[in-house]
Every structure is written in structure tokens, then in C-alpha cells.
Regions:
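Conserved active-site alpha-helix within GNAT-family acetyltransferase domains
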Residues: 98, 122-141
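Conserved beta-strand-loop-alpha-helix junction that forms the acyl-donor binding cleft
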Residues: 117-127, 144-149
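Conserved GNAT acetyl-CoA-binding A-motif
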Residues: 108-119
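Acetyl-CoA-dependent GNAT
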Residues: 11-14, 22-77, 83, 88, ...
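Conserved acetyl-CoA-binding loop-helix of GNAT-fold acetyltransferases
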Residues: 87, 93-106, 129-133
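Conserved N-terminal entry element of GNAT/NAT acetyltransferase domains
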Residues: 1-15
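Conserved functional loop/turn residues at catalytic and ligand-binding sites
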Residues: 16, 84-86, 90-91, 95, ...
Length: 149
């Protein structure tokens, strides 16, 4: 993968939330996830928000949070959840996701967080590849059910 040396990653600021919501929310560049709503975007923890930029333009974001005793992994205690990673289409393939993940890994290591989680769709093979390249390993699968009435 080519990497662009002009891509920088910085901590998120309150003024970044509007851009995150615009690009990720309804009507943005990303198909809206029915399990995420606007109120959830407003609760993004700023200490876990990372912004990637290229020549002053917004290239993508990553946000994460710290937690304790996840319900889905009974033996775990302290952990970090990489909640969302988004790279604008025109910046994909240039190492933006890799840089965001590298910064995330440095931040959680500095805080002494021993265990990291990320979840993605089973059809999102690009994300699976990115996470596996970063050292994440699959450990749990979930199934969503639906019923028409």
C-alpha cells in the first residue's frame, strides 16, 4: 500500500464533530448504519477522536473509547473499543486508515490498556484486511435477525 507523507493525524476537537456527522451521518458519503443515530455521533468522546488530514483537508477519522468488563468477553477487564474508522473515498488506498490505527495503538499503549476490540461487517473485507494487518485477530461472530410482519 502506498502511503502519503502529507497525511497527518491529530487529536479531535469539538469543532470536528460537525464534519464527522456530515460525512458519516444521513446524507453523507457513507451509507447510514441503522444501528447508529445522530445522538450517538454527538456523544463521541473527544479524548478518543482522531482526525486525519491531507494538506488541510479532512481525510478521515477514528474514534474509540475505554471500557471495563465487556459483556462479550467474560475474562477481560480493561479494554479499548475502536468504535469507528472512516476514510473519505478520495483518500482510500494511501495509508490513511493505517496511520489512524497506528496513532490509536500508541495512545492505548500509553494508557496501559491491555486489550483492544474492533468489530466490522462480515462483508467488509477491506476493513477485515486493514484490522488483520494491524494485528487484530477474529474471535467472535454475531448474527442479526429480522422478521417481516
Amino acid at each position: 500500500m502506498a502511503t502519503d507523507p502529507g497525511v497527518t493525524v491529530r487529536p479531535g476537537r469539538i469543532e470536528d464533530l460537525a464534519e464527522v456527522a456530515r460525512l458519516y451521518g444521513p446524507g453523507g458519503e457513507t451509507p447510514w448504519d441503522p444501528f447508529i443515530d445522530a445522538a450517538r455521533l454527538e456523544r463521541i468522546p473527544l479524548d478518543g477522536l482522531l482526525i486525519a488530514e491531507k494538506d488541510g483537508s479532512y481525510a478521515g477519522f477514528l474514534y474509540w473509547f475505554e471500557g471495563r468488563k465487556p459483556w462479550f468477553d467474560k475474562g477481560a477487564d480493561q479494554y479499548a473499543q475502536l468504535e469507528e474508522l472512516h476514510v473519505r473515498p478520495e483518500f482510500q488506498g494511501w495509508g490513511v486508515a493505517q496511520r489512524l490505527i497506528e496513532r490509536f495503538l500508541r495512545e492505548v499503549a500509553a494508557r496501559g490498556i491491555p486489550l483492544l476490540y474492533v468489530a466490522t461487517d462480515e462483508t467488509n473485507t477491506a476493513a477485515q484486511h486493514i484490522y488483520q494487518e494491524a494485528g487484530f485477530q477474529p474471535f467472535l461472530r454475531t448474527i442479526h435477525y429480522r422478521k417481516y410482519t
